């Protein structure tokens, strides 16, 4: 009777230890129609790219970026009051607060294309640098090899 408890305890401990990703390494997961691409840095800032397959009322796929700051505060690119800008390869990519309009969609696709090739990037919230991420080109190209669902902003059956 003790052996099953030991196996269960070992399984729980193993799954808990794999839940925390190493800094500067992309991880991904899918659940409830959303693919998440997550990276953290040594300072404990987490960058979470959310690519949804769930359209809004206008059949727009409202992808977003969530940031969790070291103090536990979260900010979201969908918040009209928050400006998130990602800097990659000496170019800045301001994230639109919503998609479904030409300039916002174009800005989002440019951001996704650049992110898929970024060896490192900086993130700013309202013009204040909140994090630097350095996954390296090899990790980025492996983990973000297919961001096609993140590039699509309009839902179609």
Residue ranges and their predicted role:
Residues 20-157:
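A generic "folded-domain core" signal
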Residues 12:
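Basic, ligand-binding patches in group-transfer machinery
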